[in-house]
């Protein structure tokens, strides 16, 4: 009896662990991130992420970036100088190979390209960064990113910064 119970427990443990391993691959997420970029920039990203094996992922994203300036008349940032200084929006794709794995977390490089506009001309961008994700209950995840964007034909050629976000399971 004891031997059968022991074999049953081992079988259940293997079944449950394989189910959890299967749950972490081929999962889709809707991501939302907000960040601050040097110098005087804010960034918001809405993306769809398809996770493949071993936490590698493909991300399809929409990105908006706003750069504010001091109002020359007031001497500080005003509503007008914040919202109407410089704005870009991009649509792009990023491949995210996993480089760090842990029990409830993993880290990915983020390599991507995008194209968009700054409301006056077409711009292109190359994206490189690191993203670290922490798993929560029910498939929810939170993450932070360190990002570097190289923008072609934009007002600011290099953007670097940090973003925080959440991943909602689909």
Residues of each region from the PLM?
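Solvent-exposed loop/turn segments connecting transmembrane beta-strands
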Residues: 32-45, 85-87, 115-126, 150-159
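Gram-negative (and chloroplast) outer-membrane scaffold detector with strong preference
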Residues: 49-129, 134-142, 168
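Short glycine/proline- and aromatic-enriched beta-strand/turn motifs that initiate or cap beta-hairpins
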Residues: 21-66, 167-169
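Outer-membrane beta-barrel "beta-signal"
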Residues: 93, 157-170
């Amino acid at each position: 009896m004891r031997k059968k119970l022991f074999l049953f427990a081992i079988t259940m443990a293997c079944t449950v662990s394989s189910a959890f391993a299967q749950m972490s691959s081929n999962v889709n997420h809707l991501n939302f991130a907000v960040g601050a970029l040097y110098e005087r920039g804010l960034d918001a990203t809405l993306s769809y992420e398809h996770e493949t094996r071993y936490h590698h992922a493909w991300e399809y994203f929409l990105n908006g970036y706003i750069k504010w300036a001091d109002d020359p008349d007031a001497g500080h940032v005003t509503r007008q100088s914040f919202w109407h200084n410089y704005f870009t929006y991009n649509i792009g794709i990023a491949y995210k190979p996993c480089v760090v794995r842990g029990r409830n977390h993993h880290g990915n490089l983020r390599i991507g390209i995008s194209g968009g506009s700054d409301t006056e001309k077409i711009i292109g961008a190359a994206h490189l960064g690191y993203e670290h994700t922490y798993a929560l209950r029910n498939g929810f995840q939170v993450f932070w990113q360190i990002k570097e964007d190289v923008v072609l034909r934009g007002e600011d050629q290099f953007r670097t910064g940090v973003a925080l976000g959440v991943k909602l399971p689909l």
